[in-house]
């Protein structure tokens, strides 16, 4: 009975495979939105104010960072929790594949969230005259919470690695 339960639990990790595949579909949706934004901006590029263009560019950078985060979570999560990726030697392989454990992934995700939050906060500040003060305050508080959380996670990771 114990062996059966252990084997069943171990096999259940494959339930994550469709979830990671779903992230690849989310990546397709993000890419479509990215190019929709570019197509929307190009006809108006010469009549746009510089600040409006910068806001669009920040939005594109934001989407790119989210896309990178999706790829990192998708591949690292799959390799850490489901199965090793068998990529043929002839194909280009990302140099970090197989080297990122769950803790490294967590720290990279935290750093990515801080970067994404920074871009979002910059976009908000560029349009600060149209944003109520209390909303600005909450954006800053939330961003600082992300920064502090990432710092604490990195610090705790460093402590545990140093003690082992």
Swiss-Prot record:
It is a multi-pass membrane protein. Its main location: membrane. Keywords: Cell membrane, Membrane, Transmembrane, Transmembrane helix. Pfam families: UPF0114 (PF03350). InterPro entries: UPF0114 (IPR005134), UPF0114_bac (IPR020761). GO terms for cellular component: plasma membrane. It is found in: Cell membrane. GO terms for biological process: response to hydrogen peroxide. The chain crosses the membrane at residues 15-35, 53-73, 136-156. Belongs to the UPF0114 family. This is UPF0114 protein YqhA. The lineage of its organism: Bacteria, Pseudomonadati, Pseudomonadota, Gammaproteobacteria, Enterobacterales.
